[in-house]
């Protein structure tokens, strides 16, 4: 048995499920076993990306002892577009001075 964590972060809270699992289980099996899908039914493993310590992994990947499996939420806004808007606003404010 190995020890892993399944983490899901929301804007208002972060939940961590600590589990002892068999070493040959896949990421998907561990996520299903954790109970996070029952607690947060909006998670769709087809849509949501998953990772281990901030590195994207496939659902059929195996994990190691003390790994942290992270379930990522989709981005609500395009980071490039946000930077463009922020730069345009800063340019307008600089022109007013």
Curated annotation (Swiss-Prot):
Pfam family, one: Ub-RnfH
Family matches, as NCBIfam families: PRK01777.1 (NF002490)
Matching InterPro entries: Mopterin_synth/thiamin_S_b (IPR016155), RnfH (IPR005346), RnfH_sf (IPR037021)
Protein known as: Protein RnfH
Family: Belongs to the UPF0125 (RnfH) family.
Residue stretches in coiled coil: none
Gene3D superfamilies noted in UniProt: RnfH-like (3.10.20.280)
